[in-house]
């Protein structure tokens, strides 16, 4: 049995497309130069993406900042928010449940006035068919 000196080449290799030939060449060289052919393009895409996304993110926050406005005391009263009158030194915080503005000290004293030692645990009423957790 005699082996041929020429290597076997399938008939469709001559008619292969450019992308197939480039892909085969890329895969062959990838093991020789992994950083140059894989790592460097990956890092460059990440860095280019950060430069592209920075203006988009800035535009997002600028649009949000345009929506936020400072409200004067009269406008706040018109919105239904009440604040202390004459207390310029007290910082005012918004209470979302009552929509009344009050200072932190006022809230602290209100909580201290409540009797927190005598309380009773009450079960929440469940919907029909909902398990209540009792065994």
Curated annotation (Swiss-Prot):
Its main location: mitochondrion. Coiled coil: none annotated. It holds the Pfam family COX16. Keywords: Membrane, Mitochondrion, Mitochondrion inner membrane, Transit peptide, Transmembrane, Transmembrane helix. It is a single-pass membrane protein. Induction: Slightly induced during the mycelium to yeast transition. Residues 1-22 form a transit peptide. It is found in: Mitochondrion inner membrane. Belongs to the COX16 family. This is Cytochrome c oxidase assembly protein COX16, mitochondrial. It comes from Paracoccidioides brasiliensis (strain Pb18). The lineage of its organism: Eukaryota, Fungi, Dikarya, Ascomycota, Pezizomycotina.
